[in-house]
Curated annotation (Swiss-Prot):
The gene is epd. The keyword NAD applies. The lineage of its organism: Bacteria, Pseudomonadati, Pseudomonadota, Gammaproteobacteria, Enterobacterales. One of its GO terms (biological process) is pyridoxal phosphate biosynthetic process. This is D-erythrose-4-phosphate dehydrogenase. HAMAP family: E4P_dehydrog (MF_01640).
Length: 338
């Protein structure tokens, strides 16, 4: 029997999750029963069908009253601002995928559970008091039935954690720095406008904009031994999708470029197949749009200095890759038991 899910928040990630479910052929395993979103039903249907990053949705989409029709499937639409008022019990929801970007605390998760959901998966980093933070492919096997309120971490954490794990096991990481070169997001204005972060008052399409990031904290959340040993910075660039991450790590064991690339390529074809990919083609960011992997290593950009400093460039579709991991983690949560 398919897992019954509800999507709370139908923005970039919420819509990508729904599209990824249909495109990946996993509807026999996961059924979207309801979507809660404050926007109009007409707008929800339109943006599902037509997407500036991912193109037209292949399935027929129409909206009638409080229902969204996707092919032959009927999804109930809800427009409720209070989690406590959501009808998850009535709808028999197994897992809520909270893609709102607003909620992420233990209290928020408990509110979903109190409304009748068996489990909750946040599509962004949560607090330390959540039951688990999952990077699929690295620690999803640690999920237990009692883990009711879970975070899927962030798109950048999902991108870089598998690479860090591989390099650490092989060569022993001492410390590292990460620079995220991230596409612009909907918290940036089209033209200059007020924002509490003065850099984000500036037009997204006109500048490379440094922003705060909690990626270093995300790394230590998964690997506590790296506490105070990683630092991260982030810049937003004038593209609408796809992100690159520049990872530099100092390692204990001497190594060369060929060895690093061989390690990462082998992992992409083996243990991390479907999660990590590897390429040496002369590609640019748009070539990774709609790529379902969490991370794509660009082997042409690997560098090693003094045998102990490794630099890698890793791409990801920060929407599509993450949406696919949301589905993977949902299935892992269900497999762990309710």
């Amino acid at each position: 029997m398919a897992i019954r899910i509800a999507i709370n928040g139908f923005g970039r990630i919420g819509r990508s999750v729904l599209r990824a479910l249909y495109e990946s052929g996993r509807r026999a395993e996961i059924s979207v029963v309801a979507i809660n979103e404050l926007a109009s039903a007409e707008g929800m249907a339109h943006l599902l069908k037509y997407d500036s990053s991912h193109g037209r949705f292949a399935w027929d989409v129409r909206q009638e009253c409080d229902s969204l029709y996707v092919g032959d499937d009927i999804i109930r639409l809800i427009h409720q601002s209070e989690i406590e008022q959501l009808p998850w019990s009535e709808l028999g929801i197994d897992v809520v995928l909270d893609c709102s970007g607003v909620y992420g605390s233990r209290e928020d998760g408990e509110a979903h559970v109190a409304s009748g959901a068996k489990k909750v998966l946040f599509a962004h980093p949560g607090g330390h008091d959540l039951d688990a933070t999952v990077v699929y492919g690295v620690n999803h096997q640690d999920l237990r039935a009692e883990h009711r309120i879970v975070s899927n971490a962030s798109c950048t954490t999902n991108c870089i954690i598998p690479i860090i794990q591989l390099l650490d096991i092989a060569y022993g990481i001492e410390s590292g720095t990460v620079t995220t070169i991230h596409s612009s997001m909907n918290d940036q204005p089209v033209i200059d406008a007020y924002h509490q972060d003065l850099r984000r008052t500036r037009a997204a399409s006109q500048s490379i904009i440094p922003v705060d990031t909690k990626l270093a904290a995300g790394i230590t959340r998964i690997f506590p031994k790296f506490c105070d040993r990683f630092e991260a910075i982030s810049v937003r660039v004038p593209t609408i999708n796809v992100t690159a991450i520049d990872l530099s790590v100092s390692v204990t064991h001497p190594v060369g470029v060929a060895e690093v690339n061989q390690l990462l390529q082998k992992a992409a074809r083996g243990a991390f197949r479907g999660i990590v990919d590897y390429t040496e083609l002369p590609l640019v960011s748009m070539d990774f749009n709609h790529d379902p992997h969490s991370a794509i290593v660009d082997g042409t950009q690997t560098r090693v200095s003094g045998q102990h400093l490794i630099k890698t460039l890793v791409w990801c579709d920060n929407e599509w890759g993450f949406a696919n991991r949301m589905l993977d983690t949902t299935l892992a949560m269900a497999k762990s038991g309710f």
